[in-house]
């Protein structure tokens, strides 16, 4: 809840001529508007333009509204919080701000574009009638003029972000949780959402599954690619989705790593079921039909928004010793990392050696430049002609020695083997460095300590550019990478399940060491017993005449032999 407003400052403030109170506004309340999203901003701006009327329904990032106003659109922003509405009216004097419940707002004039990218959950007001989800969708559809468009994001209650959530006490701690989250009303699937909008008189142009979360989507999958397990984009999508979930859930407490759930769903063609939400673009029938082709996949990363079939130039420039670069090369091939994981699980050392040797020969002997110098094994696809880079976001400003490139890739693979708890032929290795040395030996290379530290430093630079780490976070991240050993939990997304697995591995290692100590003690005791018995027999022989005779004969034999 916000702090109590300063009444003197409120009275002295100039009147807001662009603020209209429609009734049902929430007074001592504020909504979080989230952060700017490149993907949503691009989709919205493609439908906006000079002179077009736009209704932004509910809380949205301030940058999205500013971009609409900057494009020349006539923007109306509806907010249920009076405090938020006053703040928005002061920050954007050129737009009209409506404050109140969605059900009381006068939307009879209609709009050329209706944007509800924040969903329908925050359109109702506690001070007004609680409209059902179907009624909210109907009012949104009715607000669209003929030939106008609706851009709507709808939360998926079965999404991976809800399934892995680990936030005890959120219902009592979060003020926004006054509305029940486990609602039985409204669309619960993408097909139900599109059917409802169609029944409301709209024509659905595109219906995407949004990942990883509806409030900040980074990947949109739709069209024929959604659910198609035979699509050549599948291996590339696994890499893209893994990166998106890593960025979204890095350092957040979760029940289990969402990347595993999404990866399994993607392999089964069920990614729509676990998507964070569904983004629907629809239009109201009019005199002209929109002539536009919709991409099946849209991706947003640190460089900008792009599609796999027509990669557009992203943000250029340098970050530390890295150069921003975008490589999008989806191929119908397995990922090299998946191939190596399967071979490790099968303990097929011969084929594992062949794959690593082929990767080492692909790198070459000289310094490596371009995207392949920083490509992870998960970014590489396997083809008949050898490895290919399917996805890359960075290139080194200067060429990197091939030995460092090889060591970094194999060391990172060793870290994933250990932290993910994946089976491999060398379970008794003491650390990721030892396992990386074994893998490097399969390529006929040795691994020196300075080479390993240089490879880890390079990984820290990449992670810093990718996740925006500060100096203190860099140092902590570097120390964590150096300390990876059996029993270490994942360093990026450590869920409760993964922490439990890591604890079990630590206990197993401890019990194994205790069993080894007990076995060593038993061996030592048995050998001590045997030595004591032999010593007793020797002393017994020395005390008898027969034993003494044998000892004298032995000494005489030695003297004669000399």
Which residues are covered by each model-predicted region?
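Conserved SAM-binding loop of SAM-dependent methyltransferases across substrates and taxa
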Residues: 60-72
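Boundary detector for helix-to-coil junctions that initiate low-complexity/charged tails
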Residues: 465-562
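A short glycine-rich, Lys/Arg-flanked "PGG" loop and its adjoining helix->strand segment in the class I
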Residues: 128-149
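Conserved class I S-adenosyl-L-methionine
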Residues: 152-173
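Catalytic activation segment of kinase domains across protein kinase-like and atypical kinase folds
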Residues: 169, 175-182, 367-425
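Short alpha-helix
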Residues: 182-209
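C-terminal lobe and adjacent flexible extensions of AdoMet/dcAdoMet transferase-like proteins
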Residues: 220-324
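Conserved alpha-helix/loop element of class I SAM-dependent methyltransferases that forms part
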Residues: 22-25, 30-53
